[in-house]
Amino acid sequence: MSKINKLEHIRNIGICAHIDAGKTTTTERILYYTGKSHKIGEVHEGGATMDWMEQEQERGITITSAATTCRWQDKIINIIDTPGHVDFTIEVERSLRVLDGAVAVFDGVAGVEPQSETVWRQADKYNVPRMCFVNKMDRMGADFYRCVEMLKDRLGAKPLVIQLPVGIEENFKGIIDLIKMKAVIWKDEALGAEYFEEDIPADMKDKAEEYRAKLLDMVVELDDHVMEKYLSGEEVTAEEIKRLIRKGTISAVFYPVLCGSAFKNKGVQPLLDAVVDFLPSPIDIGIVKGREVSTGEEKDFLISVTEPFAALAFKIMNDPFVGSLTFIRIYSGKITSGTTVINTVKNKREKIGRMLLMHANNREDVKEASAGDIVALAGLKDTTTGDTLSDIDQQVILERMEFPEPVIELAVEPKSTADQEKMGLALSRLAAEDPSFRVSTDYETGQTVIKGMGELHLEIIIDRMRREFKVEANIGAPQVAYRETITKVCEIDYTHKKQSGGAGQFARVKIIFEPLKEVKDLKDEDKNKIFVFESKIIGGAVPKEYIPGVEKGLNNIRETGVIAVYPMIDFKATLVDGAFHDVDSSVLAFEIAAKAAFREGMPKGNPKLLEPIMQVEVITPDEYMGDIIGDLNSRRGQIQSMDPRGNAQVVTANVPLAEMFGYVNTLRSLSQGRAQFSMIFSHYDQVPSQVADIIKAKK
């Protein structure tokens, strides 16, 4: 593919949704029709191009975000296919951070499902413009209009319907394009490559007119001139409608809704047209937030080829042929192989070696990349997810990503001494790839503990350790990742002194600890953090160079809380005063003082134990509803809602994760295998005192 330098010709998009809504199948069809793939891969056969890890092909689900580049009309589309399973939410999170637009795929039968809501909220957080593709219109029970209502009710979104389905279930044969007011019908035998326009079927004329009027009512509001034209009865042209749909989509006034059946090869080409027509180019996004290293000043940086180089690393991946690959999104400037850049987060220089354009796990070497591109760099030494790579002379740090706290953990130990060293290497490599996966050592037992977002997440980590690194390990039972916090403000004044012979140590710190939810003037960028540190030192009571030691000490010690040695979260520490000695003070002395101040001060803050609460959604036939609700209540669950969906009932409840182990078997026996459930992490909440006593006793 020849390089197009014009930023307006690039679309960086993600395809995301609930598990099984058909994201990967939709992406496969896109690759086929854009000429990237000469054979369509089917997910259920384990042949999908984008699902390239062995585990993905066996399980038929997408675990990591595969990135690929393709071409439609005169535009370059960089696509990231993201997982829909809740345990891999981090993959969605980091993809959305670097994308300019997204296609949210919905199952035409199930509509808006729990993970769809999670992904939608994540996209809201990063202000990603998006459009909706209601898939599986050929399936029994598919209902396009109900899906549109669910977009309003469950997501609070403003859908802009631009297509209607022609036929339903097995009779689904095409769409009505409400912009052109034409029907688009596919020929079955031609793998969807052949389709033709015809007049709207007579029995759908009224519905098409109704939805066309709704479409026009919404778009003309964005342009006074077009509105006047519309109100005076003049025809609004297709070009004007497209321009206003683009304007409204980019500013998130509404979300265009399309439909089709990716599996049956219907509706994919108009979806590609809509990606090009309505989703933003990097120029439409315009700026990226960050700060200048030299001044520390927060500012907006222009997305432009002519600005100094700045890129964000959003994924690390181990490739069996190339080694470690770092995926970057270039926001400004350009880079060539052989250039040296700086990782401004770690203050380490990195030399750019091989630069690759990725097509799932196939690769194409490129010598140059510029603003708007998503490329993979081979052989970077110190760069991890969320780091900024920058021009050495004009250094910037781009806004970082927030990573969720793990909710489940288990102990692993190597089966033999030969596996010991290999296991350490394997786990550190896997942790570098995935920021929601953590590795630590239990300081009491010396065991290695791995932590993640769910049982499937850790199961796949262990599986990869065995397959890719040939490490055999014994696995403990899953444990809940409890946390600790404080519930009231407390203050501690602590002096660390060691001045008896030899080099001395001296540091005094006065720190105020307070619960984050009680901090009145919390900055916006701190609202999603679990620990915030601030220095209010005036007049040099503690020299500037020692203050990072205080923050480092607190950050390290908070990993072992004061109730039952669980990590301490959701608090702010403010350094308000202190003292130093000209000879005996050092960064290390202040680090030690901060740790001791934490140990002494935190018990005064009325510390409490926290547990992860999951949002559980159960879909069940009517007759099992009573038993299922009773069982959820017995698990300390709080029922949030009960809604009919088709001929089933949907129960939503908040339930502690500790009570959900083995739930799949209970649900199976309560409903004779007819109910299904999904759960996603909701929040941390205080553990009831009688339960907390049991947890403390076990520690």
UniProtKB/Swiss-Prot annotation:
MF-aspect GO terms: GTP binding; GTPase activity; translation elongation factor activity
UniProt entry tagged with the keyword GTP-binding: yes
Annotated residues for binding of GTP: 17-24, 81-85, 135-138
Cellular compartments annotated: Cytoplasm
A Pfam family reported for this protein in Swiss-Prot or TrEMBL: EFG_C
SMART domains: EFG_C, EFG_IV
Keyword Metal-binding (UniProt): no
Primary location class: cytoplasm
UniProt domain tr-type G: residue ranges: 8-283
GO biological processes: ribosome disassembly
Key words of the record: Cytoplasm, Elongation factor, GTP-binding, Nucleotide-binding, Protein biosynthesis
A cellular-component GO term for this protein: cytoplasm
Family: Belongs to the TRAFAC class translation factor GTPase superfamily. Classic translation factor GTPase family. EF-G/EF-2 subfamily.
Protein's job: Catalyzes the GTP-dependent ribosomal translocation step during translation elongation. During this step, the ribosome changes from the pre-translocational (PRE) to the post-translocational (POST) state as the newly formed A-site-bound peptidyl-tRNA and P-site-bound deacylated tRNA move to the P and E sites, respectively. Catalyzes the coordinated movement of the two tRNA molecules, the mRNA and conformational changes in the ribosome.
Protein name: Elongation factor G
Protein species of origin: Rickettsia parkeri
